[in-house]
Amino acid sequence: MAKEIKYGIEARKALEEGVNKLANTVRVTIGPKGRNVVLDKSYGAPLITNDGVTIAKDIELEDAFENMGAQLVKEVAAKTNDVAGDGTTTATVLAQAMINEGMKNLAAGANPIVLRKGMKKATDCAVEAIAGMSEKVTGKDQIAKVAAISAGDEEVGQMVADAMEKVSNDGVITIEESKTMKTELDLVEGMQFDRGYISAYMATDMDKMEAVLDNPYILITDKKISNIQEILPVLEQIVQSGAKLLIIAEDVEGEALTTLIVNKLRGTFNVVAVKAPGYGDRRKEMLKDIAILTGGQVISEELGLELKDTTMDMLGRAKSVKVQKENTVIVDGEGAKEDIDARVAQIKAQLEETTSEFDKEKLQERLAKLAGGVAVIRVGAATETEMKEAKLRMEDALNATRAAVEEGVVSGGGSAYIHASKKVAELVKTLSGDEKIGAQIILKALEAPLFHIAYNAGLEGAVIINKVRESEVGTGFDAYKEEYVNMIDAGILDPAKVTRSALQNATSVASTLLTTESVVANIKEDAPAMPAGGAGMGGMM
């Protein structure tokens, strides 16, 4: 495929044009008075959103050179979203400001490599200042405020705070679309896994089609049970004690399943069998989790244990078990606390070592089931368009809250960047030449988020920036009420992690783009013309 190449200022101008087209679209959403953007979809209704990364991902430009610039800024939003889960619009606005300011200096003859060095020093200085301003999140109220600022909705903030309080830091909160118009929070206590009863005959409540076992014994094995003789010794002990039994096995089939069902229906004993959750090595680990949670053992030939030798003291115990068609919940397992804590520590260590996103997600789920719990927020709305938009806001709020718990909070509304810029201004005085200009690019860019928040509120950004800069750390501008307040006291908070990540990622992409000297793009080739069809059939009358 043929290539088109542009050099120097022409190349950078084309990239800058693409950057501006994408950033100008995204930045209209910043702040409490930011607007929404409507995205056309190839199928279904258009999507209305104010989520920076969703808007950025949807933008493709016709001009190949401009599109490359847009894709680079898209990288800023995506990277910030991956690291912090929020702050994508802020990162885009910062990157645009750095690129625009940097381009002016390159045109004036600055050396891009030395500029980059100055930008890096100034960013490190600002990040240090942000860390110094950060305050630990204390209590449910602050969590609710962080979530409310991110989602732009106090009700959402309260719901996320409730969910965080219920499941703790190790818990998992999932967001789903509701079948109703109401947004609801469901908490699943205990360990839940997505396997239900093997046979509907095992249900104890035929109306709800579920089986509830109080204080059952739990047989955990990775084997397939097809011969009743294998589990007969332990079944006899269960019958004599009059206890209930939950069997978790790879499968229960044939004669064994028939015998269990017949005896259940006769009332000989109360038993429910479910298939083991997960697959392969993950299944072995999940069975071990269940065993530790319930104080039982995994009956496995790998461990030298046979089903026929199983005794009641090898079985797990729980306060109650609820089994439905497609999931099982074990509540209040009777495992030793120190064993559960050791298992939690082991999973946390694995979480830190793994690089796979999929593995991280699965380990986090296991951790939640053992230590925290699982909360499900079901987002409801009148229309599908509104529901999708609400779901994106809810996800942002949740990510912002997690980031806040991790690294603390700083004053919101772009004010943290203005206060950090005071430290950067001191650094600028110690630098010289193009390195100084590079630091000044960051100094100017730090004003951009607050400037655009004010602009979207119909106010003059420069005046507000100067007023905030002159005030003490923590003071900022509440664009919704149009007044200067202590942002921490007013509950206008940003997670320090989001603030830091947005700046670092913006600098990374902007400084790389400014060092570009040539750009190579594919030349679009026209599709070959269709061969002409025969006009007629020669020789025919």
Swiss-Prot record:
<dbReference type="InterPro" id="IPR001844">
    <property type="entry name" value="Cpn60/GroEL"/>
</dbReference>
<feature type="binding site">
    <location>
        <position position="494"/>
    </location>
    <ligand>
        <name>ATP</name>
    </ligand>
</feature>
<dbReference type="InterPro" id="IPR002423">
    <property type="entry name" value="Cpn60/GroEL/TCP-1"/>
</dbReference>
<feature type="binding site">
    <location>
        <begin position="29"/>
        <end position="32"/>
    </location>
    <ligand>
        <name>ATP</name>
    </ligand>
</feature>
<dbReference type="GO" id="GO:0051082">
    <property type="term" value="F:unfolded protein binding"/>
</dbReference>
<keyword id="KW-0547">Nucleotide-binding</keyword>
<dbReference type="InterPro" id="IPR027413">
    <property type="entry name" value="GROEL-like_equatorial_sf"/>
</dbReference>
<dbReference type="GO" id="GO:0005737">
    <property type="term" value="C:cytoplasm"/>
</dbReference>
<keyword id="KW-0067">ATP-binding</keyword>
<feature type="binding site">
    <location>
        <position position="413"/>
    </location>
    <ligand>
        <name>ATP</name>
    </ligand>
</feature>
<dbReference type="GO" id="GO:0042026">
    <property type="term" value="P:protein refolding"/>
</dbReference>
<dbReference type="GO" id="GO:0005524">
    <property type="term" value="F:ATP binding"/>
</dbReference>
<feature type="binding site">
    <location>
        <begin position="86"/>
        <end position="90"/>
    </location>
    <ligand>
        <name>ATP</name>
    </ligand>
</feature>
<dbReference type="InterPro" id="IPR027409">
    <property type="entry name" value="GroEL-like_apical_dom_sf"/>
</dbReference>
<comment type="subunit">
    <text>Forms a cylinder of 14 subunits composed of two heptameric rings stacked back-to-back. Interacts with the co-chaperonin GroES.</text>
</comment>
<dbReference type="InterPro" id="IPR027410">
    <property type="entry name" value="TCP-1-like_intermed_sf"/>
</dbReference>
<keyword id="KW-0143">Chaperone</keyword>
<dbReference type="Pfam" id="PF00118">
    <property type="entry name" value="Cpn60_TCP1"/>
</dbReference>
<keyword id="KW-0963">Cytoplasm</keyword>
<comment type="function">
    <text>Together with its co-chaperonin GroES, plays an essential role in assisting protein folding. The GroEL-GroES system forms a nano-cage that allows encapsulation of the non-native substrate proteins and provides a physical environment optimized to promote and accelerate protein folding.</text>
</comment>
<keyword id="KW-0413">Isomerase</keyword>
<dbReference type="GO" id="GO:0140662">
    <property type="term" value="F:ATP-dependent protein folding chaperone"/>
</dbReference>
<dbReference type="InterPro" id="IPR018370">
    <property type="entry name" value="Chaperonin_Cpn60_CS"/>
</dbReference>
<dbReference type="GO" id="GO:0016853">
    <property type="term" value="F:isomerase activity"/>
</dbReference>
<protein>
    <recommendedName>
        <fullName>Chaperonin GroEL</fullName>
        <ecNumber>5.6.1.7</ecNumber>
    </recommendedName>
</protein>
<comment type="similarity">
    <text>Belongs to the chaperonin (HSP60) family.</text>
</comment>
